[in-house]
């Protein structure tokens, strides 16, 4: 089996899936205490890196995604599949798991 080199540009989500670069989690508390990796909350905010073509409707047409590349989004805490590319964390999830676009 041939090895596949993954990068953001080689990942193309299918259907209504969205590929999101996860924002960095907080390194310390408001009081200045440094947090170990095991105590950090899983981030729920990230930037859309890739978007699928959209959900297929019953008549065969596609429903265009509501988010686009570069949008900053808030998504469900335990949604999707976590993917690590190099030192960056990504999550691949369905568009329905995106709660809001953040400006």
From Swiss-Prot:
Main location: cytoplasm
A biological process from GO: chaperone cofactor-dependent protein refolding
SMART domains: Cpn10
Compartments it resides in: Cytoplasm
Molecular function terms from GO: ATP binding; metal ion binding; protein folding chaperone; protein-folding chaperone binding; unfolded protein binding
InterPro entries: Chaperonin_GroES, Chaperonin_GroES_sf, Chaprnonin_Cpn10_CS, GroES-like_sf
GO CC list: cytoplasm
Keywords: Chaperone, Cytoplasm
Family of the protein in this entry: Belongs to the GroES chaperonin family.
UniProt subunit comment: Heptamer of 7 subunits arranged in a ring. Interacts with the chaperonin GroEL.
Role description: Together with the chaperonin GroEL, plays an essential role in assisting protein folding. The GroEL-GroES system forms a nano-cage that allows encapsulation of the non-native substrate proteins and provides a physical environment optimized to promote and accelerate protein folding. GroES binds to the apical surface of the GroEL ring, thereby capping the opening of the GroEL channel.
Descriptive protein name: Co-chaperonin GroES
């Amino acid at each position: 089996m041939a090895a596949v080199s993954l990068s953001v540009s080689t990942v193309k989500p299918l259907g209504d899936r969205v590929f999101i670069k996860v924002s960095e989690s907080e390194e310390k508390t408001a009081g200045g205490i440094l947090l170990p990796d095991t105590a950090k909350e899983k981030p729920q905010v990230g930037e859309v890196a890739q978007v699928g073509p959209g959900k297929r409707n019953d008549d065969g047409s596609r429903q265009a995604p509501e988010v686009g590349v570069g949008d900053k989004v808030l998504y469900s805490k335990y949604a999707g599949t976590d993917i690590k590319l190099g030192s960056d964390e990504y999550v691949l999830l369905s568009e329905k798991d995106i709660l809001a676009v953040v400006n």
